[in-house]
A protein has these predicted regions:
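Short, acidic, small-residue-rich periplasmic hinge/interaction motif at the N-terminus
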Residues: 26-72, 80
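C-terminal beta-signal and adjacent terminal beta-strands/loops
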Residues: 471-472, 527-529, 534, 629-636, ...
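Gram-negative outer-membrane beta-barrel transporters
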Residues: 524-527, 545-634
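Face-selective signature of the C-terminal outer-membrane beta-barrel domain
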Residues: 244-258, 290-450, 454-456, 461, ...
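Periplasmic-side early beta-strands and strand-to-turn transitions of outer-membrane beta-barrels
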Residues: 162, 199-296
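Short acidic/polar hinge/loop motifs at secondary-structure boundaries
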Residues: 119-146, 170
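Outer membrane beta-barrel strand-and-loop segments of large Gram-negative receptors
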Residues: 344-359, 401, 493-499, 505, ...
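Short strand-turn segments of transmembrane beta-barrel domains in outer membranes
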Residues: 160, 165-200, 212, 227
Length: 709
C-alpha cells in the first residue's frame, strides 16, 4: 500500500509539472533571471536540455530549456524554427519568413511570450504575424508545456515561452561580450550579432548591457525554384541598466525590433479561376531572377519595449517585486495597388500597451506563499488615409487580474495550489467597406485554478502531474475581422457573437536520468469549451480590388485534444550520444468528432553526435548527423479544406559540425557549420499556410563564426 501511495502521489505530482511551479522550483524568477548552476553540463549539440536541473527541491513544470549555445547555433533561423527542437513543439508557418511556435497544437494568442519579465503584447493575432522579438537578445529560453494561467493570466492555454537574459554583471571588473557573424546559402543571407556587458568602474553596483542584431536576405529558394520577393531586412537592439544595493535592485530595459519582409507574389493577385489554378498547381508560375530588393507587397513591423523592474527583499516580511512595461507596436502592410498608390500602406496599425505587475512572496520552512496582481491597458488604432478599410476596428482593452499561490516542498515531495480571477473590458468601433458602423462593448471575467504535485521516487526517477483551468477572451480580430491577410493570401471573417474559451488540461510526466540514459515521457489531455479557430470555407471566395481570396471563417466548437511527447538521450560511449524526439497529437470536435484543421502530424527527429575527447582543452570539436521524418496528416477534415488531401510525408537530413578554440581565459573563438535539407528535398508542411501556393524551403547551408571576450 505504501508503494501504491507513492506511485499515486507521483502521478499527481506530474500535474504540477506544468503550470504554476515552473519558475519557483528552478529559482528561475522572472525578475532575477539567475543562471542555473545546477544544470548537468552534457555537451548537447542540438542544445535541448530538458529540465536538466537536478536539485533537492522539486521541478514543478513540464518544461524544456534552450541554452545560450543553442541560440547561437540557431543564428539565421526564426524563433519558431528553433523551438522545434523541443518535444511537443512545432511551428505554424506562412511561407519561409514567418513562423509561430505551436505547443501541443496551440498557437497564436494561446501561447504567451514573456520577454525579460514582461508579457509580449504585439499584434500576433494574424497567421502571417510572427512574434515581434529578437531571440538573440536572450541567453536562456524556457518552454513551459501547460496552461500556466494562474501566474500570468489569460492567453496561456497552450503554454509559455519565457525569454530571459542573464543577471546584469554587478561588481564585474572586466567587460565581456560576444560577436557572431553568419552566412546562409538559401537567400544568400547574412547576419551579425553583437553583445557587451560590464559594470561601471567608478560604481561597481551599477551594471550595463547592450546588444544588437542585423540581418539581410534576398529571395529564398524552394528545392527547385525561387520564391520571389521573400527577402528580409532586420535591425534590432536592446540595452539594460541596473543598480543593486544590499536587498534592493532596480533595472531598466529598452529594446527595439525592426523587421521588413517581402511577401510571395504568387498568393496576392488574380480572379477566382486563377486562384483555383494556382492552388491546383501548388507552385508559382512566373519566376523572376534572384534579387535582394524587397518589392511590393511587403510588411514592416517596429516593436518598442521599455521595462522597469524593482525588487526588494525585506527578509522578515518576504520580498516585493514590481514590473512596469510600455510597449508600442507599429505594423504596416504595403500591397500592389493601382494608380501608383503602392507606397501608401494598405494596412497601418498601431498598438500601445502599458502593463503593471506587483508580487509579494514569502518563504517559511517548507512553505511558500505568493500573491500578485496585474493590470494591462491596450489601445489599438488604425492610420487614417490609407484608402483601404482596416481589417480590424479601433479598439481598447483593459485587463485586471489577481492571484494567490500556496506551495509546499520537501526533499522528495512538492505540491501547489493556485487560484486567480481576471476581468477584461473590450471596446471596438469602426466602419466596414459598406460604410456601416460596427463594433461593440464586451466584458469577460473568469476564475482560473491549478493543482499540482511532483514526487522524486528515486534519485533518477521523477513523477510530476498538474491539472489546471485556463481561459481566453476572443480577440478583436476573431470577433470583427473582415478583410484579407497579406501574407497568407486569404480573406478572414470574424464572428462578433463568440464567447470566451475555457480549457481544462491535465499533464503527466515521467522522467528518468542517469549517466547513460535520459528519458522523458509526457502525456496530456485537454478539453477546450468554445474553442475558436479559422475554418477554410471550401468553394467560397471573396473578390476585392487586389484579387480573389479563399474565405476563412472564425467559429467556435468544443474540442478534445490529447497527445504524447517522447524525448530520449542515449550515451553508449562517453563520446557518442543518440538523441530522439517524437510527438503525436489528436484533436477532435467533441460533438461531430471532426478533426481540427492545422494540427501537426506525427513527427520524429533523431540525431547522432560524436564529441572526441582531446588531450588538450583548447579545442572542443564535435559533429552531428540528424534526420527528421514527418508523416502525412491523415487526421484532418478533407471536406472543408481548400485541398482534399494533405501533403505527402517527407524526410529531411542534416549535418552539423563545429569547434571552439579557447585562446586564453577571456577569449574563445568558435566555428559552426550547419546543413539543413542537405539532399534538397521538395516538400510541403501541412501547417504552412502558404502550402497552397508554394513548397517549403530547399537546402540551406549556414556558416557561423563567433568570438567571446
Amino acid at each position: 500500500m505504501k508503494k501504491l501511495f507513492y506511485t499515486f502521489m507521483s502521478v499527481i505530482a506530474l500535474c504540477e509539472f506544468v503550470p504554476t511551479s515552473a519558475f519557483a522550483q528552478k529559482q528561475y524568477d522572472l525578475e532575477t533571471a539567475q543562471p542555473d548552476t545546477t544544470k548537468q553540463n552534457y555537451h548537447l549539440i542540438d542544445g535541448v536540455e530538458i529540465s536538466t536541473v537536478r536539485k533537492l527541491v522539486s521541478n514543478n513544470a513540464v518544461s524544456s530549456q534552450l541554452n545560450n549555445k543553442t541560440i547561437e547555433r540557431s543564428l539565421g533561423q526564426s524563433l519558431g524554427t528553433m523551438l522545434e527542437r523541443v518535444s511537443g513543439v512545432s511551428s505554424i508557418q506562412t511561407g519561409g519568413t514567418v513562423s509561430k511556435p505551436v505547443i501541443h497544437g496551440m498557437y497564436g494568442n494561446r501561447i504567451l511570450l514573456v520577454n525579460n519579465g514582461a508579457r509580449l503584447t504585439g499584434q500576433q493575432w494574424g497567421a502571417d504575424h510572427a512574434p515581434e522579438v529578437d531571440k538573440n537578445s536572450s541567453t536562456k529560453i524556457e518552454v513551459v508545456k501547460g496552461a500556466e494561467a494562474v501566474r500570468y493570466g489569460s492567453d496561456a492555454l497552450g503554454g509559455i515561452v519565457v525569454m530571459e537574459q542573464d543577471m546584469l554583471p554587478y561588481n564585474q571588473k572586466h567587460t565581456h561580450g560576444r560577436l557572431l557573424s553568419m552566412y546562409g546559402s538559401n537567400g544568400y543571407r547574412y547576419q551579425f550579432v553583437g553583445h557587451a556587458e560590464g559594470s561601471m568602474p567608478f560604481l561597481p553596483s551599477l551594471a550595463w548591457r547592450i546588444q544588437a542584431t542585423y540581418a539581410n536576405s534576398g529571395d529564398q529558394r524552394a528545392a527547385h525554384y525561387l520564391l520571389n520577393n521573400t527577402g528580409t531586412r532586420e535591425f534590432d537592439f536592446s540595452t539594460a541598466l541596473g543598480y543593486q544595493h544590499k536587498n534592493f535592485r532596480a533595472e531598466g530595459y529598452l529594446s527595439r525590433y525592426d523587421l521588413k519582409l517581402g511577401v510571395l507574389y504568387n498568393a496576392q493577385m488574380g480572379d477566382a479561376d486563377l486562384l483555383a489554378e494556382r492552388i491546383k498547381i501548388g507552385r508559382p508560375v512566373d519566376i523572376t531572377p534572384y534579387t535582394r530588393h524587397i518589392d511590393y507587397p511587403f510588411q514592416h513591423i517596429v516593436h518598442t519595449n521599455a521595462t522597469l523592474k524593482l525588487y526588494y527583499n525585506t527578509e522578515k516580511y518576504g520580498d516585493f517585486y514590481w514590473l512596469a512595461s510600455f510597449q508600442k507596436d507599429d505594423r504596416e502592410e504595403n500591397r500592389i495597388r493601382r494608380m501608383n498608390l503602392s507606397y501608401i500602406p494598405a494596412v497601418s496599425m498601431h498598438l500601445k500597451t502599458l502593463q503593471n505587475y506587483l508580487r509579494w512572496r514569502k518563504y517559511y520552512g517548507d512553505w511558500q506563499t505568493e500573491v500578485g496582481t496585474q493590470v494591462v491597458n491596450s489601445n489599438h488604432s488604425n492610420q487614417r488615409g490609407t484608402g483601404v478599410v482596416p481589417i480590424i476596428p479601433n479598439h481598447t482593452e483593459n485587463q485586471i487580474g489577481a492571484y494567490a499561490l500556496q506551495k509546499y516542498q520537501n526533499n522528495r515531495l512538492g505540491a501547489e495550489l493556485g487560484v486567480r480571477f481576471d476581468w477584461q473590458d473590450t471596446k471596438a468601433a469602426g466602419y466596414d467597406w459598406t460604410g456601416d458602423y460596427y463594433g461593440g462593448h464586451r466584458t469577460f471575467s473568469n476564475f482560473t485554478y491549478s493543482l499540482g504535485a511532483h514526487y522524486h521516487a528515486t534519485d533518477k526517477l521523477t513523477l510530476t502531474t498538474n491539472f489546471g483551468l485556463a481561459w481566453r477572451a476572443p480577440h478583436v480580430f476573431e470577433l470583427y475581422s473582415n478583410g484579407n491577410e497579406l501574407g497568407t493570401g486569404r480573406f478572414v471573417r470574424g464572428d462578433s457573437t463568440m464567447c470566451s474559451e475555457n480549457s481544462y488540461k491535465w499533464v503527466v510526466s515521467t522522467e528518468y536520468r542517469s549517466t547513460v540514459l535520459d528519458a522523458r515521457l509526457d502525456a496530456y489531455l485537454q478539453w477546450v469549451k468554445h474553442y475558436i479557430y479559422d475554418r477554410p470555407m471550401k468553394g467560397e471566395y471573396v473578390t476585392v480590388i487586389s484579387g480573389t481570396y479563399p474565405l476563412f471563417q472564425y467559429m467556435q466548437t468544443d474540442v478534445f485534444i490529447r497527445g504524447i511527447d517522447f524525448d530520449l538521450r542515449l550515451r553508449p560511449l562517453s563520446a557518442i550520444e543518440y538523441h530522439i524526439v517524437s510527438s503525436m497529437i489528436w484533436a477532435n470536435e467533441t460533438r461531430t468528432h471532426n478533426y481540427l484543421p492545422y494540427i501537426p502530424s506525427f513527427r520524429i527527429n533523431h540525431s547522432l553526435t560524436y564529441t572526441p575527447h582531446l588531450s588538450g582543452k583548447a579545442f572542443a570539436p564535435w559533429i552531428e548527423v540528424k534526420h527528421r521524418f514527418v508523416a502525412r496528416q491523415t487526421r484532418f477534415n478533407a471536406a472543408s479544406d481548400l485541398i482534399a488531401y494533405a501533403p505527402a510525408s517527407y524526410s529531411l537530413f542534416g549535418l552539423e559540425a563545429g569547434t571552439e578554440w579557447r585562446i586564453d581565459t577571456h577569449n574563445t573563438l568558435s566555428l559552426f557549420v550547419s546543413a539543413d535539407n542537405i539532399f534538397n528535398k521538395e516538400y510541403k508542411e501541412y501547417t504552412n499556410r502558404a502550402r497552397y501556393y508554394a513548397h517549403d524551403l530547399g537546402r540551406d547551408i549556414r556558416l557561423t563564426i563567433g568570438w567571446k571576450f
